[in-house]
Amino acid sequence: MNRGFFNMLGRRPFPAPTAMWRPRRRRQAAPMPARNGLASQIQQLTTAVSALVIGQATRPQPPRPRPPPRQKKQAPKQPPKPKKPKTQEKKKKQPAKPKPGKRQRMALKLEADRLFDVKNEDGDVIGHALAMEGKVMKPLHVKGTIDHPVLSKLKFTKSSAYDMEFAQLPVNMRSEAFTYTSEHPEGFYNWHHGAVQYSGGRFTIPRGVGGRGDSGRPIMDNSGRVVAIVLGGADEGTRTALSVVTWNSKGKTIKTTPEGTEEWSAAPLVTAMCLLGNVSFPCDRPPTCYTREPSRALDILEENVNHEAYDTLLNAILRCGSSGRSKRSVIDDFTLTSPYLGTCSYCHHTVPCFSPVKIEQVWDEADDNTIRIQTSAQFGYDQSGAASANKYRYMSLKQDHTVKEGTMDDIKISTSGPCRRLSYKGYFLLAKCPPGDSVTVSIVSSNSATSCTLARKIKPKFVGREKYDLPPVHGKKIPCTVYDRLKETTAGYITMHRPRPHAYTSYLEESSGKVYAKPPSGKNITYECKCGDYKTGTVSTRTEITGCTAIKQCVAYKSDQTKWVFNSPDLIRHDDHTAQGKLHLPFKLIPSTCMVPVAHAPNVIHGFKHISLQLDTDHLTLLTTRRLGANPEPTTEWIVGKTVRNFTVDRDGLEYIWGNHEPVRVYAQESAPGDPHGWPHEIVQHYYHRHPVYTILAVASATVAMMIGVTVAVLCACKARRECLTPYALAPNAVIPTSLALLCCVRSANAETFTETMSYLWSNSQPFFWVQLCIPLAAFIVLMRCCSCCLPFLVVAGAYLAKVDAYEHATTVPNVPQIPYKALVERAGYAPLNLEITVMSSEVLPSTNQEYITCKFTTVVPSPKIKCCGSLECQPAAHADYTCKVFGGVYPFMWGGAQCFCDSENSQMSEAYVELSADCASDHAQAIKVHTAAMKVGLRIVYGNTTSFLDVYVNGVTPGTSKDLKVIAGPISASFTPFDHKVVIHRGLVYNYDFPEYGAMKPGAFGDIQATSLTSKDLIASTDIRLLKPSAKNVHVPYTQASSGFEMWKNNSGRPLQETAPFGCKIAVNPLRAVDCSYGNIPISIDIPNAAFIRTSDAPLVSTVKCEVSECTYSADFGGMATLQYVSDREGQCPVHSHSSTATLQESTVHVLEKGAVTVHFSTASPQANFIVSLCGKKTTCNAECKPPADHIVSTPHKNDQEFQAAISKTSWSWLFALFGGASSLLIIGLMIFACSMMLTSTRR
């Protein structure tokens, strides 16, 4: 479906949009023909109801509400079962809903007779279908039937690529259909739930607006035209990004799917069943609730703690079947829990103590210096456990140890300074804190003050490439992760349990050698004693325990099993409730955007093959560079203050990134001082800067050659003089011109003629005579044989070519994105056809296999098991890195006193294991193995006046098609991939890293905790947990453990491939790929349709053409200008092409007259650009003497490579030839001969 759903409809003009204030249905009701059957009744009913309910607000009459009796009279006119709609309508009008806004009213009015419900077999609405532009369209993932007697019987065409299906709309319904538009500038649009914002190429809505069941709804502009159809949504924090179908200006359908999108079709309701003992019940309708039977309700939750519908059961247990708002406002999941006292390491920054605000854990994974704190107190609840926004509750340290409450103003949080509290819920606080070495939570009231300090280093954090202490007011927004301040979000679960009852010494009294159980007023307590025999009992008044003489022989406690507490190691696990519950961990770590500073842009000074960056910043800013060739040579440096950095730039280019600025790519031009067409010293100066080594070698060679030539000439002259004068030295007074004597000594030599040679062979070797004579005859015979064999082939080929539908053209295109390759297709009998192939994009797509994911782990230390006067035994457990150990001779002591009546026969079973961190979903790394890579390119092909875009795999096999065009590309000349065999992906960044294999964990190293996915149950780990013997002062579980290998890897991961990849590759993920790598050449075979060619008789015929270059600057841009003067037989379009790789023309086709001139622009990298240009097939040569460019550095890559024959100017060659064989050489030789003659003709006696 290359044209989407509207191939035929895109060419007709859109009908004029209907005005919003004039209801279209009422205006057209009179002239419409009467419809027969059920469809007509439904249409009339829909029109009437819409006019009464919605159109009332738009009528041009006084805004009086319609009397209720008239609405009731209209209701019975609905099809059978009138009572059911009545009750439904009454139910809808009972809640006091806010009045719909203007955008909602408009959407509702337009959707009234154009949008249809899609229902499943049970009659539930699961999505929508809409009538638009002569078609009825429905999302493919909405599996149901359109609630319309006619539309439900239509045959739909499916398109899985766009997740849509469509059918032709009946003719009598087309006038009521929507129209669509491809124009959607940034701003706000309308849909069923209000406003939709379009920005950055995405449609977004506030979170919580819209959801399942909204698939298929339209998004409309203010004119009522559809700009998009909603398919689903992806939660992105405070807003939801919509997955939509839109259309471009050519009518082609475009599907936009944000990452993490969920389809918004309403799933069929499946009743989940939960268990209580052997009895099953629907999870959303438990047999009891917490307010009625707290203990039994907790039993139900604990038994179904691992059920997939646990959240549904938890909500049902809390709601108790009540629909009143007062109930929902005070009942919360933390109503099931209670605060507790825990052992704090530093109370008031000094000594350990039992604290009501013991800090259990601190998370600091957010990028905005926000921390999440878990304590033993509860925030947002009053003393009774009801939700109260301005209160908190805590376990009192006083003798009664009851739950107390206070105002949230008493809660203070600090690190190295005060923190700002952002949100709170249950055991958790969310605060933004300055850096520090510890975290302190304090309760400061007028009566008392208590605090707890946890040693935890809070490091200053920043995102981006510039360090800052405080986020700027103005700057740039980049992706980051923050804690969601909404209390309703969940980051996972925390484990809860009902602890063993705490024994309080205050419940026992010793008097006169007797022990008494002394319960608080109106409370029951249970005592256990070992006074010879084991004794136990439950009393409500002061009672003597017979046989006991000391308090240490007994323990007494209150039994309350109606509350959960956090599974803290400071509490004792209950023997009867080993099952655990779980509650949601609030304040999820979510992706967001953070404001970061942007350093002052560098002052860039361009030089010859180098740039200087003058940098000035008042905070640490990162500067990274890499070369865009085969050897990237990446550099990284943090800079502060004023400084200058110099970098060499070559033809391949250099990329530098300064702070949070966008990457900048620069390329060196072959600019140089001097003039390649000037005097010798200017030529030497020019080439010395461009090619210093070769220039030095050439000048040195020329100098040496001249010195050798002069030296040899002088020596030869001396020797000739000596040799010639020697014979006359014996003849006294001889005067003879020596030059004449030398000339006489030279013998003449002439080659024999053909006749003399043949006569000699006939006389001396007749066989060779005949062989010599047969050579021309043999050549003639071979030539005739070849012609006789080729003639039938040429005849058959010519007949076959006349029948084919396409002409195949093969060429090789450089794999350099955005650089066009141009060719001229010359076909016998047809006019030349210009062909331009541009690699718009390229992707190296490796096949990958995810080995595992890893992230920061959380150590879970459950409440220990205590056995008084006995021993325990460890049992195996299905947890990652599970460690268990039993310690004997312990003396458990808590804030209520001793918990056992034995001194040393007690035992404690300590356990510990690890889990994925609650923030692992937002901060984890993928360990991936990379295998064979495939390559895909996006091509832009222009032939004649036709432009086509297509994607094709570069494997030499798989064809790519676009309309009548067929292309086969590859294989590429050189295989390349920037990825090693093992890579790690973390937050969109890719690292080549040799990670450990799955199952080969090492404590403190990358991969110390591994899972195949974030939701899998196959978690394995090795963190070297070692349990230690607890001390007697309090109940606790001491242990040691290796630090997180994931955190250590993050701090030493090095630079990602995005900054170090060769060939200028851009690395992307989801899927893993390398984009726009400039390397290699791609062979391409293209079948050009016959319709693209023009017969020679129909094309202009250029008889003469002449090229004159008016201006030429060799550079990366089109710096040359040439004028082609021509004579043609007719007016028309002519292809113009450069047949030399020395120059590339900017134009592909020009308009010619019968006689005239056209100007073309060309790009060359050579100072002497001599290239052949053809106009309508007529060729001529352009000779250009190009000047060096003024700009040393440019931002565009070169379009041509320099060739040897064009690298040296014609003037340089002239000077070089003149040096060795021109007039100067002749002059030197003449002078030498003259000198020799003078010496030889001189007389000596």
Swiss-Prot record:
Q: What segment(s) does the record annotate as region Dimerization of the capsid protein?
A: 185-195, 221-225
Summary of activators and inhibitors of this protein: The channel activity is blocked by 5-N, N-Hexamethylene amiloride.
Q: Which residues lie on this side of the membrane: Cytoplasmic?
A: 719-751, 785, 1240-1245
Q: Where is the Peptidase S3 domain?
A: 114-264
Which residue intervals are annotated with compositional bias (Basic residues) in the record?
67-106
Which residues does the record list as glycosylated? 278, 524, 646, 945, 1051
Segments of this protein annotated with the region Functions as an uncleaved signal peptide for the precursor of protein E3/E2: 265-279
Annotated region (Interaction with spike glycoprotein E2), positions in chain: 157-162, 249-253
Task: Specify the effect of residue 442 to R.
Answer: Causes attenuation of the virus
Query: Which residues constitute the signal peptide according to the record?
Result: none
Q: Where is this region: Binding to the viral RNA?
A: 86-115
> Which residues does the annotated region (Host transcription inhibition) include?
37-70
Where does motif Nuclear export signal map? 146-156
Q: Where is this region: Interaction with the capsid protein?
A: 719-723
Q: Name one GO biological process term.
A: fusion of virus membrane with host endosome membrane
Provide GO CC annotations from the record.
Answer: host cell cytoplasm; host cell nucleus; host cell plasma membrane; icosahedral viral capsid, spike; membrane; T=4 icosahedral viral capsid; viral envelope; virion membrane
**Which positions does the site annotation Involved in dimerization of the capsid protein cover?**
189, 222
Catalytic activity annotated for this protein? Answer: Autocatalytic release of the core protein from the N-terminus of the togavirus structural polyprotein by hydrolysis of a -Trp-|-Ser- bond
Region (Ribosome-binding) residue ranges read 100-114
InterPro entries assigned to the protein according to its UniProt record, in alphabetical order: Alpha_E1_glycop, Alpha_E2_glycop, Alpha_E3_glycop, Alphavir_E2_A, Alphavir_E2_B, Alphavir_E2_C, Flavivir/Alphavir_Ig-like_sf, Glycoprot_cen/dimer_sf
Q: Name one GO molecular function term.
A: RNA binding
Tell me the residue ranges located in the Extracellular compartment per UniProt. 329-690, 752-763, 807-1214
Q: Which family does it belong to?
A: Belongs to the alphavirus structural polyprotein family.
Q: What is this protein called?
A: Structural polyprotein
Q: Which organism is it from?
A: Sindbis virus
